[in-house]
Amino acid sequence: MSAQREGSLEAPTRQPLDWRNPDFYDGAKLYAELERVFGHCHGCRRCLSLCDSFPTLFDLVDNSETLEVDGVAKKDYWKVVDQCYLCDLCYMSKCPYVPPHEWNIDFPQLMLRAKAARFKEHGARTRDKLLASTDLVGTVAGIPGISVLVNAASRSGPLRKALEKVAGIHAGARLPCYQSRPLRRRLAGPRGLDPAVAVAGVRSRGKVALFATCYANRNEPGLGEDLVAVLEHNGIPVTVPQQERCCGMPRLELGDLESVARAKEQNIPQLARLVDDGWDILALVPSCVLLFKQQLPLLFAGDEQVKKVAAAFFDPFEYLLARHKEHWLNQCPFRLGVFKVGH
């Protein structure tokens, strides 16, 4: 009998997702893998304090006749899947059995597989398709004049109740406001710093192409303007890609991998050209960064442009910290005193 070692003693690794393989969507094989992984999770429970997937799973097991995963109805597995939003916390911080452990548990990627199999067979609900259509909704809702009506409607109790009945969006859910002057338009045209003045460091090349993201572009453009101000204050030239569409993360969370592939085909070539021209890439929304740095390389493992973009992609704070460690940030001349500086 071979001895089983406790996990998390080696750096975790991930295998590419073979999502083009018909076996990826095979119902019987999917249920068998869900039962296997759920069984290990039930016996461990270190992840209880994370998202609702795990309390949901453990309640199903504890209320079953056998008190084991085999007592849980297969149809109830989807209650667990629906609670996962692919944040990766269980994989990164809790699970002791991630690869290269022999149990080979990658809970978020299994949830993505389940979502993809369901989407392939059943599609998505109207509500989910609407919320995931960020480019379309943002373009229409951002039309001057229309944005005023949309923002007023999102605060109207009667209209929100009607929307809940029609589209399933809860009347009490907070919806973002839409701006008629998006971030990409605000940043269009020549910027204040010449890219030729960029100073490269060890990890960073000192000039940034900003992937605006749907949220910062249409809903909170001030976030992008603030980030650009910080970058330019520190001598970092900024540009924006000529074109940009939704990164595909909302579609990934639905399991709509074909739509993710289409978004990749539009975004990656131009981002790769920017990388070739010496630009680092930043995005304002963490889930967008996660998609470009991690999910796309797993979905398209053989695509060299995807790898190139992933290597040059940064979270804004990650980027600023790298510049700070390389002594390329301008220090703010704060004078410390009582009530002078607040955080």
Whereabouts are the PLM-identified features?
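Non-heme iron-sulfur electron-transfer modules
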Residues: 6-24, 49-85, 97-127
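A short, structure-level motif marking secondary-structure boundaries and short turns
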Residues: 22-23, 32-33, 66, 211-213, ...
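Immediate flanking context of iron-sulfur cluster ligation sites
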Residues: 28-43, 73-90, 205, 233-243, ...
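Short cysteine clusters
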Residues: 41-47, 51, 84-91, 95, ...
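Glycine-rich, histidine-containing beta strand-loop boundary motifs that form or position
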Residues: 45, 55, 88, 94-99, ...
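Iron-sulfur cluster-binding electron-transfer modules in prokaryotic oxidoreductases
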Residues: 105-343
